[in-house]
């Protein structure tokens, strides 16, 4: 079987994207890095986004860190998801930065969260720390859109969390709020502050926040599609 090659330009169809992702299934991160001419870091401590970058190279992703989807022409977002030996997610999944000001008139339908989760290419990757990074294998991809029930679940959480932000309760939000979608601080250091609305409607400075999918949501999603027991 011939070795796969990274896509040199963004895929033109979902079928092309999925076919390329399927070719990567079973390869280790070290093998894919070597084929792409990259060096595999020893661990992810200083290169937290390295796996995502590697797979973006292989799949011809275009967005980088821009707010649009990774495959903007197709409206598809790429999400790598570290899993254990049973295929269960090991951590929450970052969706996007949570807007803390300027939220008047924003609805679920027009929200950045929904835009990012409208169509997702999930790629599970072995994530157990006992496996050296270079030896971790890439799993079968899944091209997914939320069904009615998933959309309703996410919408309810989003509305609850956004109400708290708009009403000046940002400092009261914990990772426990929201059944499937959570908000928590997203900053490499505690000095990176951003503006938000305070309890009395005043402007305050707080840590940037991000929206994350909880493991119970991604776990059910993967189990349903891959028939994990």
From Swiss-Prot:
Entry-linked SUPFAM superfamilies: Restriction endonuclease-like
Gene3D superfamilies for the chain: DNA mismatch repair MutH/Restriction endonuclease, type II
Keyword annotations of the record: Cytoplasm, DNA damage, DNA repair, Endonuclease, Hydrolase, Nuclease
Compartment annotation: Cytoplasm
Principal location: cytoplasm
GO BP annotations, alphabetical order: DNA modification; mismatch repair
InterPro entries for this protein: DNA_mismatch_repair_MutH, DNA_rep_MutH/RE_typeII_Sau3AI, DNA_rep_MutH/T2_RE_sf, Restrct_endonuc-II-like
Molecular function, one GO term: endonuclease activity
Record keyword Transit peptide present: no
Keyword Hydrolase applies: yes
Intrachain disulfide bonds: none
Pfam family, one: MutH
TM ranges: none
A GO CC annotation given for this chain: cytoplasm
Protein family (similarity comment): Belongs to the MutH family.
Protein function: Sequence-specific endonuclease that cleaves unmethylated GATC sequences. It is involved in DNA mismatch repair.
Record's protein name: DNA mismatch repair protein MutH
Species the sequence originates in: Escherichia coli O6:H1 (strain CFT073 / ATCC 700928 / UPEC)
Name of the gene: mutH
């Amino acid at each position: 079987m011939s070795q796969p090659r990274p896509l040199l330009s963004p895929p033109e169809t979902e079928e092309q994207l999925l076919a390329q992702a399927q070719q990567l299934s079973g390869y280790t991160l070290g093998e894919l890095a070597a084929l792409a001419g990259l060096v595999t870091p020893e661990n992810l401590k200083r290169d937290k986004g390295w796996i995502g970058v590697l797979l973006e190279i292989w799949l011809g992703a275009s967005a980088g860190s821009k707010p649009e989807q990774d495959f903007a022409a197709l409206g598809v977002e790429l999400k790598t998801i570290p899993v254990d030996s049973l295929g269960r997610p090991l951590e929450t999944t970052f969706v996007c930065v949570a807007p803390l000001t300027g939220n008047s008139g924003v609805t679920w339908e027009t929200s950045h969260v929904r835009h990012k989760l409208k169509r997702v290419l999930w790629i599970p990757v072995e994530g157990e720390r006992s496996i050296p990074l270079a030896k971790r294998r890439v799993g079968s991809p899944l091209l997914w859109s939320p069904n009615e029930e998933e959309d309703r679940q996410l919408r309810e959480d989003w509305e609850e969390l956004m109400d708290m932000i708009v009403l000046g309760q940002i400092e009261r939000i914990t990772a426990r709020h929201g059944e499937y979608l959570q908000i928590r601080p997203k900053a490499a250091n505690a000095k990176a502050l951003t503006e938000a609305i305070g309890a009395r409607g005043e402007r305050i400075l707080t840590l940037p926040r991000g929206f994350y999918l909880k493991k119970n949501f991604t776990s059910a999603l993967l189990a349903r599609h891959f028939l994990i027991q």
